[in-house]
């Protein structure tokens, strides 16, 4: 399993604060609302999966805002 770093995620998100909000929203979607992960699960916690999705550029804040509507 590759380790996800904040720097990997910041290539796709403007700042650390937005990263925290984005990752927490996505992790909540995966764990509580049954959304399917966009990366392989690999027995990780939902927060790690969310960070891996962000680092891969698969999740953006715009996508999550649209999903809330």
UniProtKB/Swiss-Prot annotation:
GO terms for cellular component: DNA-directed RNA polymerase complex. The keyword Nucleotidyltransferase applies. It catalyses: RNA(n) + a ribonucleoside 5'-triphosphate = RNA(n+1) + diphosphate. Its EC number is 2.7.7.6. One of its GO terms (molecular function) is DNA binding. Keywords: DNA-directed RNA polymerase, Nucleotidyltransferase, Transcription, Transferase. InterPro entries: DNA-dir_RNA_pol_omega, Pol_omega/Rpo6/RPB6, RPB6/omega-like_sf. One of its GO terms (biological process) is DNA-templated transcription. Promotes RNA polymerase assembly. Latches the N- and C-terminal regions of the beta' subunit thereby facilitating its interaction with the beta and alpha subunits. NCBIfam families: rpoZ. Belongs to the RNA polymerase subunit omega family. The RNAP catalytic core consists of 2 alpha, 1 beta, 1 beta' and 1 omega subunit. When a sigma factor is associated with the core the holoenzyme is formed, which can initiate transcription. This is DNA-directed RNA polymerase subunit omega. It comes from Hahella chejuensis (strain KCTC 2396). The gene is rpoZ.
